[in-house]
């Protein structure tokens, strides 16, 4: 079955053009700078936040993940977050957010505060 996926990975002209346009948008809209700023704010907001139920907090770019020891700790989080204007849900033992690159600082803080409030109120 050699080259079975050849058409998928060959230089499809439309796909190449779309990829180049996407790269141009990243450069023109300073997207990488926005992602770095999101990460910086997230690190500042999450600094020092601990809870004995949390195994680890990971942050990379526009993603934050709180891993807990027991997934039952996260039961009910989606409804809790919705009441605070945040659409989010846990997955297994992970409470995470992958925010859009156009998020405002106030909106980002709202997402992070909601995550922290879940642990503080329980």
What are these language model-derived features?
Residues 1-122:
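Conserved N-terminal phosphate-binding loop of PLP-dependent enzymes in the Aspartate aminotransferase
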């Amino acid at each position: 079955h050699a080259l079975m996926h050849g058409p998928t990975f060959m230089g499809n002209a439309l796909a190449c053009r779309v990829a180049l346009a996407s790269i141009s948008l990243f450069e023109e809209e300073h997207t990488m700078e926005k992602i770095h700023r999101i990460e910086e704010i997230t690190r500042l907001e999450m600094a020092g936040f601990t809870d004995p139920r949390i195994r680890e907090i990971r942050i990379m770019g526009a993603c934050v993940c709180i891993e807990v020891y027991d997934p039952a700790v996260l039961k009910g989080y989606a409804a809790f977050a919705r009441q605070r204007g945040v659409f989010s849900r846990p997955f297994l033992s992970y409470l995470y957010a992958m925010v859009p690159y156009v998020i405002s600082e106030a909106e980002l803080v709202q997402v992070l505060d909601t995550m922290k409030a879940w642990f503080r109120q329980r």
